[in-house]
Design a protein with these regions (language model features):
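Residues in and immediately flanking transmembrane alpha helices
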Residues: 20, 92, 301-304
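A general lysine-centric signal
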Residues: 6-7, 66, 79, 247
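Sec-dependent N-terminal signal peptides of Gram-positive bacterial secreted proteins and lipoproteins
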Residues: 2-27
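Domain-terminus/edge residues, biased toward the C-terminal soluble/receptor-binding domains
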Residues: 166-167, 178-339
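Active-site-adjacent loops and short helices of periplasmic peptidoglycan-processing enzymes
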Residues: 25-187, 191-200
């Protein structure tokens, strides 16, 4: 009995230590300090993007933020949610028939792969078109295939965002083309991406740099798709070897937007930058932030449930639920400043 009590106390003490160490990060989320103030106090590099965040992909810990709760237009990083929901709720082997709305409902000057009304394409190929070439008509068609209509899919997007804790996100379409009522934040996009990365299939689609769509019923030529995220291309000046995937976005109203994730030194980080003058700035900002965190932080596992017997872990968890509102913590990872 005494041994169990000691285990309970130890569990609680380590959990409280973890929570207390995370408090400054939570405070930083809502800070109104200017970017220059934040950079001056933390030593992080100066960045140009209006909003940014670095989040630990395992724990959700915020390591860096700049205006991360300020609403921004997301542009095509919207497609992270679209792809994730398609994988979660759709049939990758199903055949999509392009509707008139999907083909002609988009701005033809925006990103597309020239799919035509009545053309048939697999759900899998449509996802590659979305994640590599940012094909707007493919995103619309995926929405119709999964939910029966664009409107139903958008409702699913918003319901999912809300369930993930996104408080400043509202979607009106599946592709991110500009709409004044289509917005999110860097923080919310990090939450959405963290959830998407729990899907192995999503990670596989997002990590591809090249894909071929075979001839269809209305097109005799193979479509060659290449990755639009230049941090993943070895021949690019922005190539970042640790980058495992991501999604770019740009509209005149949104500016440059980018979500990327990278893994190095046993750390997996999500970086979101929004409101940049161009995508080149997204790349340089993201690389600078990644380099700083990977060079100055390390991931420390504080404890795991298996280190305590079930009775002790359950009792301690109930205490944390009552006093801190914490859900099951399981294995806790903390990114620690090495300096």
């Amino acid at each position: 009995m005494i041994k169990t009590v000691k285990k309970i106390i130890s569990y609680i003490m380590v959990c409280v230590l973890f929570l207390s160490m995370c408090i400054p990060c939570e405070a930083a989320q809502t800070s109104t300090a200017t970017a220059s103030d934040a950079n001056a106090t933390t030593g992080f590099p100066q960045i140009t993007s209006t909003s940014a965040i670095i989040m630990d992909a395992q724990s959700g810990q915020i390591i860096y933020e700049k205006n991360s709760h300020t609403r921004q237009y997301p542009a095509s990083i919207t497609k992270i949610m679209t792809a994730y929901l398609a994988i979660k709720n759709g049939d990758l082997n199903s055949t999509i028939t392009m509707s008139d709305a999907a083909v002609w409902g988009i701005d033809r000057n925006s990103s597309h792969i020239a799919l035509d009304v009545g053309e048939e394409i697999s759900m899998s190929d449509a996802l590659y078109a979305v994640m590599l070439m940012s094909a707007n008509e493919a995103a619309w068609a995926i929405a119709e295939q999964v939910s029966g209509s664009l409107e139903n899919f958008v409702q699913l997007m918003n319901d999912t965002a809300q369930s993930l804790g996104c408080k400043d996100t509202h979607f009106t379409n599946a592709n991110g083309l500009h709409d004044p009522d289509h917005y999110t934040t860097a923080y919310d996009m990090a939450l959405i991406t963290k959830e998407a990365l729990t899907s192995k299939t999503f990670r596989e689609y997002a990590s591809e740099t090249y894909h071929e769509i075979p001839p269809t019923n209305m097109n005799n030529e193979t479509r060659y798709l290449t990755q639009g995220n230049r941090m993943m291309l070895s021949n690019s000046e922005y190539y970042y070897p640790a980058c495992q995937g991501g999604k770019t976005g740009y509209t005149d109203d949104a500016g440059g937007t980018l979500v990327v994730w990278a893994e190095k030194n046993d750390m997996q980080l999500i970086c979101v930058t929004m409101g940049a003058p161009d995508n080149a700035t997204n790349y340089t900002d993201s690389i600078a932030l990644f380099n700083y965190v990977f060079n100055n932080y390390s991931n420390t596992t504080l404890l795991s449930d298996y280190e305590f017997d079930a009775e002790a872990a359950t009792t301690a968890q109930n205490f944390l639920n009552d006093y801190y509102g914490c859900e099951n913590l399981g294995t806790m990872h903390l990114s620690v400043d090495n300096n």
